[in-house]
């Protein structure tokens, strides 16, 4: 598949999830998203209203992070926070699974949590992304989660929050994609800071990239295409 600069930009969830982010920081994030035509801004739930107002009358989404970054909230709390975020303007949701219950092998809990989160998102026609936080998981746990997702069908499964000890890995993206196939998309996030890493994740099967380095990445890709005198880059997946 051949990608233009805009195609690449539309893969990016432009991210600022820092605890000390100000309204000025959020405005900058949204302004950059508009300038580069990113797909979404990824922000903490409490900033849903502010960012959705900044992005009004654009095709750029406001993505609220739920139970971020630990996932240690009840299902009821996650569902409440999701609906609250949506009512305040969020039109994409990324939530962190309850890793404790996964470690307990309480797969019924994980399945019920995912089902309720997907249902509340889809009630409002909002995409739901499930954050695995792979740095804490074994390969078998990643596989099991992906199998549950294949059954429940969230819109995306996601590698990481970016706040754990490590972020996205190419082998994890490949593993996740190999299980869900075309039923669910994969989002790579965490530690993707340059154009080589970005392209590697797309080649591995990621359909969305969460990163705070989106401007730097797009500018590097523009320069690469200019140097090669091309308007597209072909990616074989």
From Swiss-Prot:
It comes from Lactobacillus johnsonii (strain CNCM I-12250 / La1 / NCC 533). Belongs to the DeoC/FbaB aldolase family. DeoC type 1 subfamily. Keywords: Cytoplasm, Lyase, Schiff base. GO terms for biological process: 2-deoxyribose 1-phosphate catabolic process; carbohydrate catabolic process; deoxyribonucleotide catabolic process. Disulfide bonds: none annotated. Its EC number is 4.1.2.4. GO terms for molecular function: deoxyribose-phosphate aldolase activity. The lineage of its organism: Bacteria, Bacillati, Bacillota, Bacilli, Lactobacillales. HAMAP family: DeoC_type1 (MF_00114). It comes from the Bacteria. This is Deoxyribose-phosphate aldolase. Pathway: Carbohydrate degradation; 2-deoxy-D-ribose 1-phosphate degradation; D-glyceraldehyde 3-phosphate and acetaldehyde from 2-deoxy-alpha-D-ribose 1-phosphate: step 2/2. It catalyses: 2-deoxy-D-ribose 5-phosphate = D-glyceraldehyde 3-phosphate + acetaldehyde. The gene is deoC. Catalyzes a reversible aldol reaction between acetaldehyde and D-glyceraldehyde 3-phosphate to generate 2-deoxy-D-ribose 5-phosphate. One of its GO terms (cellular component) is cytoplasm. The active site is at 94 (proton donor/acceptor), 158 (schiff-base intermediate with acetaldehyde), 187 (proton donor/acceptor). Gene3D superfamilies: Aldolase class I.
């Amino acid at each position: 598949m051949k990608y233009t600069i805009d195609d690449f930009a539309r893969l990016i969830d432009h991210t600022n999830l820092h605890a000390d982010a100000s309204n000025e920081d959020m405005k900058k994030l949204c302004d950059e998203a508009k300038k580069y035509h990113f797909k979404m801004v990824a922000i903490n739930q409490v900033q849903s209203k502010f960012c959705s107002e900044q992005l009004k009358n654009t095709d750029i989404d406001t993505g609220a992070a739920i139970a971020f970054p630990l996932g240690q909230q009840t299902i009821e709390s996650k569902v409440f926070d999701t609906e609250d975020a949506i009512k305040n303007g969020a039109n994409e949701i990324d939530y962190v699974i309850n890793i404790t219950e996964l470690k307990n092998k309480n797969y019924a809990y994980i399945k019920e949590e995912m089902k309720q989160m997907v249902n509340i998102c889809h009630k409002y026609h909002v995409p739901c992304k499930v954050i695995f936080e792979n740095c804490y998981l074994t390969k078998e746990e990643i596989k099991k989660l992906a199998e549950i997702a294949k059954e429940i069908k969230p819109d995306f499964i996601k590698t990481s929050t970016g706040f754990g000890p490590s972020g996205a890995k190419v082998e994890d993206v490949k593993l996740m994609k190999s299980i869900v196939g075309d039923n669910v998309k994969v989002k790579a996030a965490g530690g993707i800071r340059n154009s080589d890493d970005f392209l590697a994740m797309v080649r591995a099967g990621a359909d969305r990239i969460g990163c705070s380095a989106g401007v730097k990445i797009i500018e590097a890709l523009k320069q690469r295409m200019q140097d090669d005198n091309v308007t597209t880059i072909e990616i074989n997946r």
